[in-house]
Amino acid sequence: MVFSMLLAAALLHPGAAAAQEVKQIKLTEKQIQGYVGAAKDMTRLYAGANPDQPNPKVEAQAAAVAKKNGFASLDDYDNASMNISMIMAGIDPQSKKFTEPPEQTKKQIADLKGDKSVPEAEKKEELAQLDAALKNVKPVQFKENIALVLKNYDKLAPLMEESGSGPRPAD
């Protein structure tokens, strides 16, 4: 459950390969605006899609949406969207303060350990997944991306909620 929320935060649409490491890129204002322009169409295209069985027709339509919004390819869109999502997942909606991904994972571990409502077997499994994720999660490589996403937060937050990978809940 917690791990899937972390994964959902890193992956914006089902067309992206599950559990792949985010290729960190330096975001531009043009990419943010392109993402904003493409997000609703992408969410609509991938609604109900099976991520394990990509549909070539849907992928072609998604590539056209990406190109229409200034991306060289669907992969280019995916890289930008994953970087945006990774940062959005670390922003507290109330304070607008950013927490690096490793610190987010450490907090999830601490919260889960203290959560009495989660059955022990489930807790043990989720803690193992979070511990494994902690070994691989990396801080944001391009710190200027944080400021760029924060600048556009009010445009991005509703799009994240629509796609099901909204900003993390307030503490």
What is each residue range found by the language model?
Residues M1-S4:
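Bacterial N-terminal signal peptides that target proteins for export
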Residues A10-L12:
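Membrane-interface helical sensory segment of bacterial ECF anti-sigma factor regulators
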Residues A63-Q129, K135-Q141, L148, N152:
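Mature extracellular/secreted ectodomains of secretory-pathway proteins
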Residues A18-A64, K143-L150, D154-D171:
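Immediate post-signal-peptide N-terminus of mature secreted/exported proteins
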Residues P14-A16:
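N-terminal signal peptide c-region/cleavage motif recognized by signal peptidases
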Residues L7:
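C-terminal active-site/capping subdomain that shapes the small-molecule cofactor and substrate pocket
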